[in-house]
Every structure is written in structure tokens, then in C-alpha cells.
């Protein structure tokens, strides 16, 4: 008799995705981040659901409702901090996942890569709107500054901003709609994840060598299920350490002050995971130019498949490209640092140089380096 997991219509899908899936025998721990992102999304949806049961999206009571969750709801504090720090873990995994894709040339699976870029944009939008909900000072002013950027769009900009606000400033209508979108987007993300996996399973996974591995596959279960479980344990340990010992390490103290439209905080800055993009935005003196650079800092990932000039897929055997890759990583860390600094000398010029280097590396230096490597290998 055939096993039910191979015949049942629903279990068959699970079986082909998680159990009998042929996987390369040599994928390293860098391939763990996909499943870790799935875990993060699950944690965020569950904790978010419980928070939504007690949260009120009204300007008068939003801040108080978050305080009420932390003080009066059973284990409300741990749910709130798991959700807030879970977002940080989510972005750490996202950045490592994308970095892995760049290093090992996974972007040559263009459909999977493009859905991944959509997922990145959707996650960033969700995180931004979630940051507005506690209605602290940084929530309010962050929402004001970022939504205001759309006014840089010629002709329709001002109308567009007022349409998003639902009025002439960030107010009750804005908070209510942000809550609605923040609630629905994770489910859209979950649907996109399914599409992401659908396209990935059409081609099979890449591997560190970048060489086709069809002749050497192993079943996903038990080999990679056990490997993913180790990743889960490490991620949960790190998250719980953050939540239980340093819950406010990655937050902003300004957000413990209720939103006040009459008092602007001295340094308006987003959560740490947006600082690199914020630094790129601030490095251009022109408003529209800054907004374009901000969008392009992520959208530039979409041109990577077209800029792949190397005859090899992975960077595993390309030391020159590896060097440029790690310079890019260092550059992004520099941008993250600059994004959190005030707009004054020397931070302005460092930010401008780092922003210029970011685009230069991706658009020119890395493709040129690949061509040089081809020449050196006489390919």
C-alpha cells in the first residue's frame, strides 16, 4: 500500500516541499535562513494577533493600550517584546539571506529572486507601519517624515501625501489605516512566500559551488529538517536573550514619550534595520533625488541578474569578487552607523561617500571584477 503522504492531495504538497524534496548534499548553514525567515514570520503573525486583541488604533488610546498590554495583560510584556525584537531578528535573517543570494549567485533564479525583492519591500512596509502603531514620539515623527517624502513626486505628490494621511497631517485616520495595513500585509507576505517557494522548487536549490547538483541529491527529511531545527533553536535562544535581558536594546527611548505634534525630537531616525537606506536618503541634498536613491537602494537588487558577467555562478572560487563583496558588507555597516548619527560634519561626507560606493560597487566594480577574473582564468 502506498504511503498516505504520497497520495493524499494536501499531504502530497507538504511531502514534495518538506519531506521527499531532493536537496543538494552540500548546502551550508547559509541555506538555513529561508526556514528561519518562515519561523520569524510565524512568530510575528502569532504575537501580532495576540497584541491586536488588546490594541486600540485611536490616537487618544493607542499609547495607553500598549502600556496596558505591558502592565495588565497576562504575559503581555513578553508578547510585546517578542513582537518588537522579532522584527529585528526577521531583518537580520533577511539581510543574511539576501547576502547569501548575492555571494553564491542565487539571483540567477530570476523569478525566485524577483519575488524575494517584492517580499523585502512588503516586509519593510509592514515594519514601518508597525513602528507607527505604539504612537510614541518616534512613531509619530517617523510616520510624518517618511510619508512626507512622497510629496517629492512631481505634480501629484502633495495630493498623494494627503490621501495617505487621510487629512492634512498624520492623525487618527492615518493610525487606523496603518493598523489595518499592518494587520493584512503579513498574510500577503505569507502568500508571496508560497510563490517564492513554488518558483524555487521549479529549479531546485543552488549550492555553495554554484554547480548543478542534480547528480548528487539527498532527501530534505531527515537531513535538512534536523539542520533547520538547530537553526530554530539558535534563533529562539537569541530572540529570548534579547527579550528577557535587553528588551529595549534596539528600540528608541523617544518612543516611551507619547506622540506630540508640537514637539519635534532632536534626532528623528527609524529602527536600526532601515538606517542604511535612511543614510542613503539623507546623503542627497535634493528631496526627489533622495527619495529615488532610497527606493533604488533596494530596487537595485533587481538588476543583479543582468550584471552577472562572470563565467562562474558562485563567488566561492573568485577571491577578487569576494573582496568586493566584503567591502560592500562593510559599506552597508558604515551606512547603518551613519544613518543613526546627526546631520553634521564629518558624518555628512562619510554618508555621501558610502552611498556613492554602494551604487558604484554593485553597478560597476563587481561586474568589472568578474570580467577581469574571466580573463585571468582564460575563459
UniProtKB/Swiss-Prot annotation:
Binds 2 heme b groups non-covalently. Keywords: Electron transport, Heme, Iron, Membrane, Metal-binding, Mitochondrion, Mitochondrion inner membrane, Respiratory chain, Transmembrane, Transmembrane helix, Transport, Ubiquinone. A ubiquinone binds at residue 201. It is found in: Mitochondrion inner membrane. Its main location: mitochondrion. Pfam families: Cytochrom_B_C (PF00032), Cytochrome_B (PF00033). Heme b b562 binds at residues 83, 182. PROSITE patterns: CYTB_CTER (PS51003), CYTB_NTER (PS51002). GO terms for biological process: mitochondrial electron transport, ubiquinol to cytochrome c. The chain crosses the membrane at residues 33-53, 77-98, 113-133, 178-198, 226-246, 288-308, 320-340, 347-367. InterPro entries: Cyt_b/b6_C, Cyt_b/b6_C_sf, Cyt_b/b6_N, Cytb/b6-like_sf, Cytochrome_b, Cytochrome_b_C_euk/bac, Cytochrome_b_N_euk/bac, Di-haem_cyt_TM. The keyword Electron transport applies. Heme b b566 binds at residues 97, 196. GO terms for cellular component: mitochondrial inner membrane; respiratory chain complex III. Its cofactor is heme b. GO terms for molecular function: metal ion binding; ubiquinol-cytochrome-c reductase activity. Heme 1 (or BL or b562) is low-potential and absorbs at about 562 nm, and heme 2 (or BH or b566) is high-potential and absorbs at about 566 nm. The cytochrome bc1 complex contains 11 subunits: 3 respiratory subunits (MT-CYB, CYC1 and UQCRFS1), 2 core proteins (UQCRC1 and UQCRC2) and 6 low-molecular weight proteins (UQCRH/QCR6, UQCRB/QCR7, UQCRQ/QCR8, UQCR10/QCR9, UQCR11/QCR10 and a cleavage product of UQCRFS1). This cytochrome bc1 complex then forms a dimer. This is Cytochrome b. It comes from Ochotona erythrotis (Chinese red pika).
